[in-house]
């Protein structure tokens, strides 16, 4: 009887181990070096993004999950419901800086990672179809060289680790422009997608008060928005908007533009007009160690 009980107990413990991660066996993400190695894993991506499109179309044998925002993705990963999720490499930097229990697979687009064009993985400013702001903003963006773009990204990644603490250094991207009109540029973003955009409680490191909330917005997108507004000589307002409502808000004229880590995919280009890309990145997979 004792042997039977011991056997039953051992089986029960094994089943508990197998189901401790959301009712499934945890996949060893350290064995992944390219997309084909993901077969058998449960991987997630944000709904309505190229991340999800690529994950669905370019992987086989993968259980795919989708979540509405990156906060939910992080919760799902830490709870063991998923093995990993797709993100831009700068997002991985920021997330891991605040969550040392996480790591990422450094996939390279069109090499060992996702097949993607610059339009797929680049991010651009979106305006209403036919907006005269597109060529003006393209001129502004052309003044930001690649070195400055990367230096700014490295700074905002560090800022995102302690957003309400002053970085103690000048930002890589600044403008000498001043407001020369009473025009206000209304820009929408999630304010929850570090290091591109996030919310914080103070105006540290050049954060901007969120027009429709009590917090402040900061991040790469916010600094780009500030630079554009300053170079155009207009006022700036930042609005916190759910991802799924960004494009419809611009189409309705509620906001002038979107600066939210948004890629100019073909589907979106049919709905809004995009500027040239202001940042390009590899798509990687964040996982729990």
Name each model-derived stretch.
Residues 1-8:
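Positively charged n-region of N-terminal signal peptides that target proteins for export
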Residues 11-15:
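Alpha-helical transmembrane segments
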Residues 16-20:
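C-terminal motif of bacterial Sec signal peptides marking the signal peptidase cleavage site
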Residues 23-38, 94-120, 127, 226, ...:
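Acidic, polar ligand-binding/catalytic clefts
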Residues 25-30, 39-41, 48, 53-124:
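Ordered, small/hydrophobic-rich secondary-structure cores
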Residues 26-35, 156-185:
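Bacterial Sec-exported substrate-binding components of ABC uptake systems
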Residues 37, 42-47, 51, 57-58, ...:
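Extracytoplasmic small-molecule ligand-binding "clamshell" domains
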